């Protein structure tokens, strides 16, 4: 009997499913807030925006008057075919106030993988310039090339859920600080689940848990020393003591961000020149 029970135990271990990662975006009808945090006050997170259709579904960070940095997994096929169906709410701590501006174009990183979550980064261009340099509306400072967050406390903000699976909507923006986790420690924690690449870094209270970003926080910024070093990407649950949250490492994408913004400007110039020539030739004839 003991041998039979032992064999049953071995079979159960062999076929046990590893934990699955959860992308920290909500469906487009759900909302929520930071795990283990407190309400933000004016000036805490002026880079923070809410991405919305009919309601909040992801976060993002202002990086210039016309550009928002967010996570690639926040964007779906409908968004790409109809960018104008998405709005950015900024200059607010409250989801019911602030300023709404429509999205003009969306750029998802060409090598983003929804299987590995590598290159989980995207850019949104707004139809009009945002009115910045206000208490709750300031462009985030980008890090230097090669910046690799491995030590210190991340500052996170957002409207993500209190617990994994929650759908409770907060009134105000939440904030929390979370200690960074060494990449090798993080990689070991995620062994057999997902590969932690050089394009990612991790943060969480290993062995303790309780503070983290969660569903609805995806795409929001991870700040370190007042620089936008990361984008909220994925984790196993939220605030799990065994699995730190994983963030896209912004310093790996500075060239991509610059080229993407330039290509949009080049396209706009080309369109304007074509329109001018069309009108000019039409006037002559």
Curated annotation (Swiss-Prot):
Function: Digests TAMe (p-toluene arginine methyl ester), but not ethyl N-benzoyl-L-tyrosinate (BTEE).
An annotated GO cellular component: extracellular region
Active site per UniProt: 73, 120, 218
Keywords attached to this entry: Allergen, Disulfide bond, Hydrolase, Protease, Secreted, Serine protease, Signal, Zymogen
S-S pairs: 58-74, 186-202, 214-238
Domain Peptidase S1: 34-262
Protein name: Trypsin Tyr p 3.0101
Keyword Mitochondrion tagged: no
Residue(s) at site: Required for specificity: 212
Name of a matching Pfam family: Trypsin
Species of provenance: Tyrophagus putrescentiae (Mold mite)
GO biological process: proteolysis
MF terms (GO), sorted A to Z: serine-type endopeptidase activity
